[in-house]
Amino acid sequence: MHLLPELASHHAVSIPELLVSRDERQARQHVWLKRHPVPLVSFTVVAPGPIKDCEVTRRIFNHGVTALRALAAKQGWQIQEQAALVSASGPEGMLSIAAPARDLKLATIELEHSHPLGRLWDIDVLTPEGEILSRRDYSLPPRRCLLCEQSAAVCARGKTHQLTDLLNRMEALLNDVDACNVN
């Protein structure tokens, strides 16, 4: 289920392309939920800027896939089906996991908090009925910015930071993980 970094497109996506990609992801999620009546993990990489598919995002994605598989194995949860693809919005993974949806969401939230790359992952958990479990459902604060203590959404909306600073931080986090062989 890993993606080859050297095959990244480096395509700069437009807002309309991102919106179409989001709609296509939702359609894929509904197909998966019909095929497997268990919770679905939908996994993407948080990638600021117009280039969503590059070597860095694919490497970050691959670490996330490894971490999600390890989480399922550690918990004794069966992965019924898994797939990876690349859309206009970058690398995407889907895993149908036989586990209680709320337990799965709490475990993925912990993974996002505890893994050095977790801040760069967007891990959604959908119930078998298609409900997306949110951080708000657990009274958790919104995601923090990569560079400061503000909410990531506030900084993104206000364009508080330079894109190059955000991308450099992403790459530094990735290089630290690779240097330490963290999975």
UniProtKB/Swiss-Prot annotation:
Keyword Transferase included in the entry's annotation: yes
Catalytically driven reaction(s): apo-[citrate lyase ACP] + 2'-(5''-triphospho-alpha-D-ribosyl)-3'-dephospho-CoA = holo-[citrate lyase ACP] + diphosphate
GO-annotated molecular function: holo-citrate lyase synthase activity
InterPro entries found in the cross-reference section: CitX
GO biological process terms, semicolon-separated: prosthetic group biosynthetic process
Pfam families registered for this protein in UniProt: CitX
Leader sequence residues: none
Alphabetical UniProt keywords: Nucleotidyltransferase, Transferase
Known EC number: 2.7.7.61
Family stated for the protein in its record: Belongs to the CitX family.
UniProt function note: Transfers 2-(5''-triphosphoribosyl)-3'-dephosphocoenzyme-A on a serine residue to the apo-acyl carrier protein (gamma chain) of the citrate lyase to yield holo-acyl carrier protein.
HAMAP family, per the entry: CitX (MF_00398)
Protein name: Apo-citrate lyase phosphoribosyl-dephospho-CoA transferase
